[in-house]
Amino acid sequence: MITIPMTENGPDMDMVEKYVENDSTVKGIWCVPKYSNPDGITYSDETVKRFAALKPAAKDFRIMWDNAYCIHEISDTPDVLLNIMDECKKTGNEDLPIMFCSTSKITFPGSGVAALAASENNLKVLREKYNYEIISYDKLNMLRHVRFFKNYDGVLKHMEKHKKILKPKFDIVLD
């Protein structure tokens, strides 16, 4: 495990590029690109573009794009994160990112509903690898989430409740 320092724009991309492009034993990087802990940094457009333009020494290198806080807004002017897949397609690197998110930090930790997105090549590999790992998904939990939220607007309305609780706490710490 290699620790990469954070800057105000995200990970130190000079260091990321040095390791990823010169060391074939580096197989991946884990990123929380929006409101990344501990400083709440959202990766800049330049950082996302540099990730998309990586030329990994390892052909099986992947960017694990954990967008855990994709809708966790506490201001009226939320950070905007560039779409990593769109940028990777522009550079011919659509197989680099494996993107995911979940409702774990929205509903119940460890009991949320997750989503995964990736290129068709990556999805094929993931389907083959994980097809036999589980008998079935927790369909009752999925149903609970659908009935509770109803639709995307329902998720956003729920996040407004989170904002009302969390914003005053952030204001105290940040002021």
Set out the residue ranges of the language-model regions:
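PLP-dependent class I/II
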Residues: 1-175
